[in-house]
A protein has these predicted regions:
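Conserved AMP-binding/adenylation subdomain of ANL enzymes
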Residues: 79-96, 104-144, 154, 158
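Short beta-strand->loop structural element characteristic of the AMP-binding/adenylate-forming
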Residues: 1, 69-72, 99, 121-127, ...
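Gly/Ser/Thr-rich phosphate-binding loop
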Residues: 35, 89, 117, 142-147, ...
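Short beta-strand elements of ligand-binding domains
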Residues: 9-18, 173-174
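Conserved pre-ATP/AMP-binding loop-to-beta segment of ANL
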Residues: 13-14, 25, 29-31, 37-60, ...
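Conserved S/T- and glycine-rich ATP-binding loop of Class I adenylate-forming
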Residues: 55, 61-64, 97, 103, ...
Length: 206
C-alpha cells in the first residue's frame, strides 16, 4: 500500500531470511538480495569520493525518540565515528570483533568501517543465539562486540548450559536505553566489561 502512493517507481530488493517465519513473509520486489549481488562487476573501477561530505549511506529510523526519518551519513562523519570509537572504547590493533548488530541498525553501528581500519578480524553472527555467541567467543578469541540491551538480557538470562567460561575479558558496547544495573553486574560476573553509550541514528549509532 505504501509503494502505491509513490509517484516514481523504486527498486525493491527482497531478502530471503532462512531464520524468518516464511508463512509471514511476502516478496514485493523484482530482485532477491543474493541474485542482486551476483549482478555486480568484479572489475568495477572504484573511485574515491571527491569530497569528504559526500554521502556514504542512508539509514532509516522508526523514530524511537522522535519522528521516523531517513538519515544520510557522509564519509567525514563515518570516519570520525570510527576513529572516535577506537579511542573511546580502547580498541587495539588486530582485534577480534563479533558482529551482532545488523547492518540495518545504523550500519552495524559503523563497525564495518572501524574494524578494517584497525586491521581487525570480523566474526559474523547471522542469528542472535546465546549459545552460538559463547561458542564464537571461545573459538575465535573474540575481544569485542556490540549489542542492544536486549542482547545483554539474553546473555545473562540464558541457561548455564549455553554459557562458556571466558578465556579473556570481552569488551561489550551497548547503546540506547540504559540496561538495569543488575544486568551490568551479571555481565561483569560472566567476564564481560560493558560500556553504555548514547544511541541515536543521527549520530551514527552512538
Amino acid at each position: 500500500k505504501a509503494l502505491s502512493t509513490l509517484k516514481k517507481k523504486i527498486t525493491i530488493i527482497d531478502i530471503v531470511d532462512k531464520y524468518a517465519d516464511q508463512s509471514k513473509c511476502e516478496k514485493i520486489g523484482d530482485l532477491e538480495y543474493e541474485s542482486f549481488l551476483n549482478t555486480g562487476d568484479e572489475n568495477f573501477d572504484w573511485k574515491m569520493p571527491e569530497d569528504e561530505w559526500q554521502a556514504i549511506s542512508l539509514s532509516y529510523t522508526s523514530g524511537t525518540t522522535g519522528n521516523p526519518k531517513g538519515v544520510v551519513y557522509h564519509h567525514r562523519g563515518s570516519y570520525l565515528m570510527s576513529t572516535g570509537s577506537a579511542v573511546a572504547w580502547n580498541m587495539p590493533n588486530r582485534l577480534n570483533f563479533l558482529t551482532i548488530v545488523p547492518m540495518f541498525h545504523c550500519n552495524g553501528w559503523g563497525y564495518p568501517w572501524t574494524i578494517p581500519m584497525l586491521n581487525g578480524r570480523t566474526i559474523c553472527l547471522r542469528n542472535i543465539d546465546v549459545k552460538k555467541i559463547f561458542e564464537l567467543i571461545d573459538k575465535y578469541n573474540v575481544t569485542h562486540f556490540g549489542g542492544a540491551p536486549i542482547v545483554l538480557n539474553m546473555i545473562t538470562g540464558a541457561p548455564e548450559s549455553d554459557k562458556k567460561k571466558l578465556k579473556q575479558k570481552v569488551y561489550v558496547l551497548t547503546a540506547g536505553a540504559p540496561p538495569p544495573s543488575i544486568i551490568f553486574k551479571k555481565m561483569n560476573e560472566l567476564g564481560f566489561e560493558v560500556m553504555h553509550v548514547y544511541g541515536l541514528t543521527e549520530t551514527y549509532g552512538h
